[in-house]
Amino acid sequence: MGSASRGPRAILLLTLVLGFLIAPLTAEAQRPAKVWRIGLFHVGLDHVPPSLDGLREGLKALGYEDGKNIRLDWRNLLDEDAAQVTAREWVRDGVDLIVAFEPQTVRAAKAATSQVPIVFLHVDDPVTDGFVASFARPGGNLTGFAGRPTLRDKQLEIFKELVPGLRRLLVLRDPTDPATVRMSAVVQEAAATLKLHLVEREVTTAADIERVFGALKPGEVDGVFLISPRLEMNYLSLILRLASERHLPLPGPLKLWVTRGALFYYGVNYPALGGAAAQYVDKILKGAKPADLPVEYPRRFELILNRNTARAFGLTIPPSLLLQADEVMR
């Protein structure tokens, strides 16, 4: 009898033990999967950053689906003041990571938090700008991808090759943009080598830009060049329109400018850059610290030419540039 009665008790005890062991596993299985919240922002209402689609596609390829295991809060903003308000809102709401697409949004994000990870793109020199301690060891909560300010000299070389009569160049510079001094030095050195005379004008607002173009005399300059990222981000449509009205060629700082009439674009392949940034986002969400992820330079560049714009200016694209071009728009 004793041994017979122990059988049911043993079975009951085993059932209870298994129940205690399985219950946490069942609860874990029923717990909803983590939905990562990411804030992405950019300043410049008339366009979106060219690396945005590449970033989204890269995240999707890595298994992130917006609305399921990730929520992307994308904001395209008027100015840096709006970026500061947005960054503080995200920090208050507890986002898991911030993606900042140019210096104005990087400054806003950095000012808002020292804890939330920040991945930046479209920044020429993050060390000089004070965003990171070094390329190899960023420190803090920021990392990302730097541009190459020396691309400006290559852009001038291509400009001169496309426009053989280029002698005097209207250069628009924003003195309030921290990158302007650095860019100016590169452009001035390249211009001296190419024997170009720079007609430099300081502008910060749309009214300033209108005034400078309105004061130009016929034949005073042969083309237009920008050296301040803030101008490139904020005044795309205005500068293209004013240059076109005065029949002045200019290169585009983004491929988008070429689709709207700029003569050419030479620079970073931004869709590829967005894909690389997605990998950094993935690493951070999986536990990597921004301080330990080195700032990287873009690895892919492209030359985009606008044949219709060249014809409108009476220019013939040299065969050497046609061979180098990744795309020729017609």
Predicted regions and their residues:
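Short hydrophobic alpha-helices and adjacent helix-cap/hinge residues
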Residues: 1-330
